[in-house]
Amino acid sequence: PKFMLNEGAPVVQAPSIGPKTAKRLEAVGVKTIADLLALNAELGEQQIDARHISAKVIRDWQAQALLACTVPGMKSREAQALVACGIEDAADLAESDPTHLCEGVAQWGLSDEGQRAWGTAPAPTGDDVATWIERAKRAIQEGKANVAA
């Protein structure tokens, strides 16, 4: 599978970022995925000055975008689920236990945030999660799990 996101893509294509948030980010110079990955989260929180956009939220967006840029076939909702489970990059994913991670993703899927992100898509199976882990391992082996953040 191909990468679902690249560094040159507009920031609105990042997981969790819709048109309104993209406009807020663009107003502080964050126009692309590369800009998002390079953003200092604390500084971004101050510059954006919106109560719901904290440094932690920005770091979550960065981790989601990084996963979508470095793990082939990683969909936005999958990246959101993984970051909610504490997975921040391909290395974290590659070292994960599929059964444990599948349980975490399922729990998150029951939350309001999870239901918004996942929508009507079927919940990932243990096989799906194992596939994500294998793709992360392969990307690392092939040297593709690095972006110029």
Predicted segments, located by residue:
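C-terminal extensions
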Residues: 1-149
